[in-house]
Swiss-Prot record:
Misc: Bacitracin is thought to be involved in the inhibition of peptidoglycan synthesis by sequestering undecaprenyl diphosphate, thereby reducing the pool of lipid carrier available.
Swiss-Prot/TrEMBL catalytic activity: di-trans,octa-cis-undecaprenyl diphosphate + H2O = di-trans,octa-cis-undecaprenyl phosphate + phosphate + H(+)
Name of the gene this protein is made from: uppP
Family in the record: Belongs to the UppP family.
GO cellular component terms listed in the entry, alphabetical order: plasma membrane
Source organism (scientific name): Vibrio campbellii (strain ATCC BAA-1116)
HAMAP family: Undec_diphosphatase (MF_01006)
Domain of life assignment: Bacteria
EC class of the enzyme, as a word: hydrolase
InterPro entries given in the database record: UppP (IPR003824)
Name listed for the protein in its UniProt record: Undecaprenyl-diphosphatase
Length: 267
């Protein structure tokens, strides 16, 4: 892997991690079209660190408040809306953890293909369009109960299927439940913190036990590039989502999905 490849892959990861357009659909393109080799475990860990830093720093006030409220609820019986939201994020994280442990090998062997990614990119894009068109858009993230949190968590678990998009699935589920677009995005981004942490930790443990060589320059390129691109992406997505809706992302997903199919059929 060259520094140029490291920069492009980290840029793709940072820009697509928090948009409802599927990072896996984009990360398959360089290898499918340009023949780039797999970037390796160390680089995967690096871009996870970069995107995690971006969302934690962007939502730093909310993260601190939610952590304080969570511990206050455990040790002091705090029942504030912040404590409730913190617990809803915990509940929403559980399905992905269970699904990941049970289905990880099946997904890796049978579902990580370009045809699956193209199909899910299209199907979940159409689902996002339908939900956004018919949603009530009235609730905020603090109105989340355990049933809603579990429903969104199941959507996050299904997003482990390549091409689905974690943010796309969770935002779609939240919109279906009546969240405003901005609230759906905020809840999705806050939900990403524990799941990216767990995924990065798992990859980190695999890296340690694999003995794979680590190139510090590539790692720093991955961390810095994914951090900057993800931070900018979060900022502008939240600023623009209420007025532009999900249609631009739906159109983009359809173009990407059908374009990937066309490439595969011609290859």
């Amino acid at each position: 892997m060259s520094y140029f490849e490291a920069f492009i892959l980290a840029l793709i990861q940072g820009l697509t991690e928090f948009l409802p357009i599927s990072s896996s659909a984009h990360l398959i393109l360089p290898s499918a079209i340009l023949g780039w080799e797999d970037q390796g475990l160390a680089f995967d860990v690096a871009v996870h660190v970069g995107t995690l830093m971006a969302v934690v720093i962007y939502f730093r006030q909310e993260v601190i408040t939610l952590f304080q409220a969570l511990f206050a609820s455990i040790f002091k019986g705090d029942r504030s809306k912040e404590a409730k939201l913190a617990w809803m994020i915990v509940i929403a994280t559980i399905p992905a953890c269970v699904f990941g442990l049970l289905m990880k090998d099946i997904i890796e062997v049978y579902l990580r293909s370009a045809y699956v990614i193209a199909t899910t990119t299209i199907i979940f894009g159409l689902l996002l369009w339908w939900v956004d068109r018919n949603a009530e858009l009235v609730a905020d993230e603090y109105q989340t109960g355990w049933k809603k949190a579990l429903f969104i968590g199941i959507a996050q678990a299904l997003a482990m299927i390549p091409g689905t998009s974690r943010s796309g699935a969770t935002i779609t589920a939240a919109l279906y439940l009546g969240f405003t677009r901005e609230a759906a995005a905020r809840f999705s981004f806050l939900m990403s913190i524990p799941i990216i942490t767990l995924a990065g930790g798992y990859l980190g443990m695999k890296l340690v036990t694999s003995g794979e060589p680590v190139h510090i320059g590539f790692l720093l390129t991955g961390i810095v590039t994914s951090f900057i691109s993800a931070y900018i992406c979060i900022h502008f997505f939240l600023k623009m989502i209420s007025r532009m809706g999900m249609t631009p992302f739906v159109i983009y997903r359809l173009i990407l999905g059908f374009g990937l199919f066309a490439f595969l059929l011609m290859a």
